[in-house]
Amino acid sequence: MKNFSSFLFFSIACSILNAQVLVKGHVNDKVTNDGLPGVTVIADSKNGAITDINGNYSLRLPAGKHALEFRMLGYSAATRSIDLKTDSLILSVVLETAARSLDVVVVSAGKFEQKLGDVTVSMAVISPQLVENRNTTTMESIIDQVPGVNVTDGQANIRGGSGFTYGGGSRVLLLVDDLPLLSADAGDVKWNFLPIENLQQIEVLKGASSALFGASALNGVINIRTAYPTATPKSSVVMYSGIYDNPERPELKWWGDKNPGFRGTYFFHSRQIGQLDLVLGGNVYENDGYRQDELEKRYRFNINTRYRFKRIQGLSAGINTNFMDVAGGNFLLWDGANQGAYRPLGGSSQQYDNIRFNVDPFLTYFTKSEGRHSLRTRYYYTLNTNDTKQRSQGKLYYAEYQYQKHFKNGLTWTTGLTGTYSEIASQLYSQHYSSNESGYTQFDKKFFNRLTVSLGLRAESYKIDTAQTTFYLRNGKDTIGKLPVQPVMRLGANYQVAKATYVRASFGQGYRFPSVAEKYIKTAVSGLEIYPNKKLGPEKGWSAELGVKQGFQVSGFRGFLDVAAFRMEYRDMMEFTFGQWGNPNTDPLFGIGFKSTNIGHTQITGIDIALEGEGKIGPVGIRLMGGYTYMNPISLDFNPAVDTIKNSSLQNILKYRYRQLGKGDIEISYKKFCIGFSMRGNDFMENIDRFFVDPFYSHVLPGIAEYRRRFHHGDVVFDSRISYQLNEMVKVSLVTNNLFNHETTSRPADVMPPRNFAIQFSMKF
C-alpha cells in the first residue's frame, strides 16, 4: 500500500509539472487601441502563435516560468515574464510604434520578423514619418540619406559597391513587399514608380545577400514594405508646391524672370471591410525642371487588397497593383561647365512618355503547427517611348513559393523556389528572352537566448538567349565538370554580450548575371556611342563584416551606435568603360565610346559607423539618424602602365567612387513645433574615365577638366525643415533643400539642383 501511495503521488506530481496551461489574450495598438492582426508571439524563443484578425492569440505552455515576446513589423517588440500554475492565464499586451532602437522589428535579414538587435548583418530602417517630413518626391532622395549609401545617377551604391553604369544593371536588389522590382530590360530601379504614399517602413540590408534574395543582391537589398489597414480606417492627403532658387553662379541660370518650380499631391486610405483589407494610394507630380527641357509629369495609382478567409483559418489571398504614366525630358550631359551647365548637350533633351505597372497576386496559409506556406507572383510591365526612336518594352513574370516553419527548439527554417521569365523588345537591342530559376534554404537558430546563428544556401540559374550560368567543378587547377547553376551561401552569427550590446559577424556570397541592356545595347547619346558586349560575363563576389551594436538610453531617448568593419571582393566585376570598342574606319569618333566590360578582380574595404535614436528628453522629442563610412575601393589586377592611361587618376582606386561618406538627419519637436536638418557629405571623386578630362576630346564634352580643377574638394549639402501642427489633423511645413545653395555634381557633366523651397500641407484623418 505504501508503494502504491508513493507511485500515485509521483504520477500526480509529474502530471502537474507537465500540464499544458492555456495562455490567451489580445494585442492592441497603444494609441488607437485597435486589435493588431499578424503579431508573432514567441515563448522562450521556441513556441509561437500568431494573432487573428481581432488581435487575439492563444497557446499552451508547460507550468512554470516563461518569457513571452510579441513582435510585429512597424512596432517595438514587447516582452512579458509569466509564472504559470495549473490554471489558464489571460495576458493582454499593447504595442508601441517602433522608435529607432534595438527593438525595431525587421523582416529582410531572414524573411521573418526579428528584432533589429538580433540580425546578423548591418541594416538601416527608415520610417514613413521621415519620408513625409522631408517632402520626399521620389524614393531615390530618401535612400541617398541612409548612412553608407549613395545614389549616383539613379544607381544605388552601398559601401562603394557600384560606380556609374548608365542605368544598366544593379548590384543592389530592390524589393517591394519582398518581391523584386527591377525592370526586365535594363535590370534597374525606376525610383519614381515606388509608392512613397503607402509605406510601413524601408529596410536597407548592407552586404552580399544573394543566398536569400538571388541575383542582383550582390551589394545589398532595399526592401520597401507597404502598410495594411487596422480596425480603424486611416486617410492622409499631402499637398506641396515649391520653387527653385537662382544658382550660386549667375551664369548657370537659363530661365528668365520666372523661376521653375514643382508641385504635387499624394493620398492614402486604408480600411477593413469585414474580412477584406483595402488600401488605396495615388500620386500626382509636376516639375518644370531646374535644367532646360528636363520636365516631368507623372500620375501614379495603387491598390492593395487582402482577404482573410473565415472558414479556412490561416488562409489569406489578395492582389496588389501599381500603375504609373510619366512623361518629360531626359537630361544626360551638360553643354559646358558655365553657361551650359543646366543646358543639355546639343541644345535639346530626349523627350519620353513611359508607362509602368505591376500586378501581384498572392496566397498565404498559416498552418496549425506554426508553419507558413506562401505563393507570391508578379507581372511587371515597362514601356519606354521617346522622340529618338529608342522604344523599349519589357515584360517580367515572377513567382515564388516559400515555406517557413518555427520549431519548438527555437529554429526557424525558410525554404523556397523562384522563377522569372522576361520578354524584351527594343529598338536599342532588338528582341531577347531571359529566365532565372533558383532554390534556397535558410536556417536561423537562437541558442541560450543570446546567440543567433544563420546559415543560408541557394542555387541560381540564369539564361539570356543562349548565354547561361555555368559553374565549373575544380580539383585544384583542373576542371572536372560543370553545372548550369551557381551555388552561393551566407553565414552569420550575433551574440548578445550584455543587455544592449550585440556583436556580430557575417559572410555572404553574391552572383549577378548581366542585364539585357548591358550585353546588347547599341545607341548614341549626345554624340557618344554606346556599344554592346555580347561576351559580357556574370560577376561573382563575397562580403564579410565584423560589427558591434550598442544600445543606449538617455531619459526617454533610446537609440544605438553601430560600428562595422567590412570587406568585399568581386571577380569579373562589370563596369561601364570608355575605350575604342567600334570600327575606327566607319564608326563616329574612330569607334571610341562606352560599353560594359568585365574589369577583373576588385576589393573594397572600410568601416561603417551608424547612429540612430528616437524618443523624448523632457518635453522635447528627438529623432536622429546619421553615420560615417570610409571605403578603399581598389583593383587587385591594377596595372599602372595600362590603367593610368584609361583613368583620370594615377592611384589605384575604382572609378566613380568616393572614399568617404557622411550622412545625418536630426529632428526636434516641442509641443506643436518641429524643426529638422539633414546633411550629406562626400570627398572628391578621384577617378573617372580619362576621356572626360583629356584635352583631345574637349570638343565632345566641354568643360569637365576645368570644372574638376575648380571644384576639386568634397561636398557637404544641408537641408532644413520646420513644421507647425495646426490641429490634430492638419500640419503645415516649410522645407528647404540645399540650404546654402552649394553647387555639386553626382558624376561628370551632371550638376545637382540649386537651393529650392517647398510649402507642404498634410492632413490625416
Q: PLM features: what roles do these ranges have?
A:
Residues 91, 193-238:
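A beta-strand signature from Gram-negative outer-membrane beta-barrel systems
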Residues 58-60, 179-208:
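Short acidic/polar hinge/loop motifs at secondary-structure boundaries
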